[in-house]
């Protein structure tokens, strides 16, 4: 019997550096486990734009993300504007993607539901 674990059930593991970023094949597999709106942008970072009907909801959403980021000890870049919160995630120590980036993305998606 095989037991599978969704990304949102896992815990981010702090990166100390010295490990290679994920390869494209691994990135594509993990990206397929996220909601469709996530992309890998031109900088090689996970990127998603969440849309809202006003200014306060993106602020509130960003605060939820901040609390989650502290809990996971993994911190995304957030950009807030009227009607939107843009999330950009990557592992800063290696300037690339690790599984923890995808775990955080999956957990952020749960905050909006």
From Swiss-Prot:
Alphabetical list of Pfam families matching this protein: Pterin_4a (PF01329)
SUPFAM superfamilies from the UniProt entry: PCD-like
Keywords, alphabetical: Lyase
Top-rank taxon, per record: Bacteria
Annotated EC: 4.2.1.96
InterPro entries tied to this protein: PCD_sf, Pterin_deHydtase
Catalytic activity annotation: (4aS,6R)-4a-hydroxy-L-erythro-5,6,7,8-tetrahydrobiopterin = (6R)-L-erythro-6,7-dihydrobiopterin + H2O
Biological process, per Gene Ontology: tetrahydrobiopterin biosynthetic process
CDD domains: PCD_DCoH_subfamily_a
NCBIfam families cross-referenced by the UniProt entry: PRK00823.1-2
Protein name as it appears in the record: Putative pterin-4-alpha-carbinolamine dehydratase
Classification lineage: Bacteria, Pseudomonadati, Pseudomonadota, Alphaproteobacteria, Rickettsiales
């Amino acid at each position: 019997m095989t037991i599978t674990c969704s990304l949102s059930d896992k815990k981010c593991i702090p990166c100390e550096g010295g490990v290679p970023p994920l390869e494209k094949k691994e990135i594509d597999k993990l990206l397929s486990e996220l909601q469709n709106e996530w992309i890998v942008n031109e900088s090689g970072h996970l990127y998603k734009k969440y849309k809202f009907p006003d200014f306060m909801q993106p602020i509130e959403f960003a605060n939820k993300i901040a609390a989650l980021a502290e809990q996971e000890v993994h911190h995304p870049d957030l950009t807030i504007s009227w009607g939107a919160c843009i999330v950009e995630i990557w592992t800063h120590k290696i300037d690339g993607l690790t599984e923890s980036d995808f775990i955080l993305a999956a957990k952020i998606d749960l905050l909006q539901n």
